[in-house]
Amino acid sequence: MQVPKNNIYTVSRLNGEVRQILEGQLGKVWLNGEISNFSAPSSGHWYLTLKDHYSQIRCAMFKGRNQSVSFKPVNGQQVLVKGAISVYEPRGDYQLLIESMLPAGDGLLAQQFEALKMKLAAQGLFAADTKRQLPKNIQRIGVITSPTGAAIRDVLHVLARRDPSIEVIIYPTQVQGESADLNICQAINIANQRLEVDVLLLTRGGGSLEDLWCFNSEALAHTIYNSALPVVSAVGHEVDTTISDYVADVRAPTPSAGAELLSQDSDNKSQRLATVLSRLKQSANHYQLKQERRLSLLEHRLQRLDPKRTLQQFEQRFDEMQLRLEAALSNKLHGLSRRQQQLANRLEKQSPKHKLALETNRLNYLATRLQDAMQDTLNQSEQRIKYAAHQLETVSPLATLSRGYSITTDANNQIIDNAAQLSVGDKINTRLRHGQVQSTVTQITDES
């Protein structure tokens, strides 16, 4: 082999020319890769390796450049960098001198998420005093989701189990992909135009940050904020958080949790019915005690007044009270019957017939007991009135006359109970059971 005399490179010369060629030919490039071997010595410079599945390249980012990076790089993080290819001549290593660095993939989305979150918070869209209270008695729920996704199946399953009387109206929409956020906005606007539901449930199942990205839309945030209907956001899993969660009136961690939040257990409804019946019974007992006190007062007044007139007034008042009691009982029973029929109609759609039959029998049983108790009270009151009237008739002067006695008075209408009160020739008047007799005293006999 013949060695050339004039074209022999030194190592330094070769590395220098390679550097000039690389820097001159490639210029600035954008590179996407995963960080490894990251180090940040006291000098403030950053040194790292960017790699993919098949290759890797050494990188350096000097202090003057890395101070503008808004995050701290870590090993395993995907980044997007811009830089120039160069050669580190002392080792003959070629490397990328990074000028700027951005998160790639989820990292970039996370950065955009935080920026939008800060912007909307500054505009007041997350303020607690703007949140609306959910209705207490929800009858109809509007679900904004994909009609074929797992979320709607979970929601319907929970509602059927907890409260089958709740009606569900689905507003179908995309929940992933390009323009999905605008599709969701349209569904919310349609629901607000129709105003056919009590509350909106915005929901979908779990997914990656990219899958859920349509729920981080600024347009969707303003649509939720301006909704006249209360909005519950139940997007993804418990660890997922979206902009819609912050803007919504209430956030639920999962679709199933959202359905549970908006429904009441059927057992709770039965308890409420039992509470209504208990209050009705207490009201009836209170009314009964009140009427008994009135009866007692009337009996006391009856003893001081004319018996017949007082008795007539009392009988009239008794009739009025009886009519009022019967009307009140009828109204209460009618109201309970109407409420029972409403519940029966709503529950009939889901066929909870057995439970409804039990509740109906229980209601009829309580109503019968209440009616019997009120009738017993009326009968007792009537007996007390009759007894009081009999007592008054017993001590009445007219009753004494009916037994054959008479009452004798002088000319001044003073009752004569002693012969010493009279003189021969005095005029006297004798009152019998039927009629009066006027007499003149002709003889006085002292039987003492």
UniProtKB/Swiss-Prot annotation:
Record flagged with keyword Cytoplasm: yes
Top-rank taxon: Bacteria
Protein name per Swiss-Prot or TrEMBL: Exodeoxyribonuclease 7 large subunit
Gene Ontology molecular function: exodeoxyribonuclease VII activity; nucleic acid binding
Protein purpose: Bidirectionally degrades single-stranded DNA into large acid-insoluble oligonucleotides, which are then degraded further into small acid-soluble oligonucleotides.
Enzymatic reactions: Exonucleolytic cleavage in either 5'- to 3'- or 3'- to 5'-direction to yield nucleoside 5'-phosphates
Origin species: Shewanella sp. (strain MR-7)
Lineage of the species this protein comes from: Bacteria, Pseudomonadati, Pseudomonadota, Gammaproteobacteria, Alteromonadales
Keywords tagged on the record: Cytoplasm, Exonuclease, Hydrolase, Nuclease
Subunit structure comment from the entry: Heterooligomer composed of large and small subunits.
Coiled-coil positions: none
CDD domains: ExoVII_LU_OBF
Pfam families, alphabetized: Exonuc_VII_L, tRNA_anti_2
Keyword Transcription assigned: no
A GO CC term attached to the entry: cytoplasm
Family to which this protein belongs: Belongs to the XseA family.
